[in-house]
């Protein structure tokens, strides 16, 4: 995983286990929590609820972000929107970064929640200060795809007591 995802920096800690169980057992705080467990139709509902996102937020630093990778079809954003709406119950700013459709009808979106209230314009301004070539290249690709999450009224919000994911995927 480290080599495939280019996670060779010494300060990156990859945890390959149930994220909720791990967070319940640790006191550590992180700058970034990345979750990659949402490939339809096999969604672990306990990693998609308000309560899970509250637990994750408690383990983020004051400047922290949570980033969740969500599989989707090229035109069905129901799961992306539901996860964004659920994330917005816990995080003041939520963004969606859509990966361009690779041409076979499936794609991914990255849903990002920030502990601090942020503005999309701040991301654009801050990206101009980057010097690492990999980060500069990534931001050039990502910035045009970033949008503020604005789920429609009535979009489901998942909780431990009610997470009808199978109705969304």
Protein language model features and the residues they cover:
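Residue-identity detector for glycine
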Residues: 1, 19, 34, 64, ...
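The AdoMet/dcAdoMet-binding core of the Class I SAM-like
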Residues: 1-67, 74-80
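C-terminal substrate-binding/active-site "lid" region of AdoMet-derived donor-dependent transferases
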Residues: 7, 54-118
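Soluble small-group transferase modules, centered on the S-adenosyl donor enzyme superfamily
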Residues: 95-169
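Short amphipathic alpha-helical surface micro-motifs
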Residues: 28, 36, 90-96, 139-140
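Composition- and surface-driven signal marking solvent-exposed, interaction-prone regions
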Residues: 47-48, 82-83, 124-127
């Amino acid at each position: 995983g480290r080599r495939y995802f280019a996670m060779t920096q010494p300060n990156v800690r990859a945890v390959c286990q149930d994220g909720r169980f791990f967070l319940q057992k640790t006191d550590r705080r992180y700058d970034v929590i990345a979750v990659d467990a949402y490939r339809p139709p096999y969604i672990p509902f306990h990693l998609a609820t308000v309560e899970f996102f509250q637990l994750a937020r408690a383990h983020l630093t004051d400047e922290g972000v949570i980033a969740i990778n969500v599989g989707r079809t090229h035109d069905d954003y129901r799961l992306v929107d539901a996860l964004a709406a659920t994330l917005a119950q816990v995080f003041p700013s939520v963004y969606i970064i859509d990966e361009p459709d690779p041409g076979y009808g499936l794609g991914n979106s990255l849903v990002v929640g920030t502990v601090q209230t942020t503005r999309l314009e701040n991301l654009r301004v801050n990206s101009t200060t980057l010097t690492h070539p990999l980060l500069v290249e990534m931001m050039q690709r990502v910035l045009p795809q970033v949008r503020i999450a604005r789920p429609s009224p009535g979009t489901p919000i998942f909780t431990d007591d009610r997470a009808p994911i199978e109705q969304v995927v």
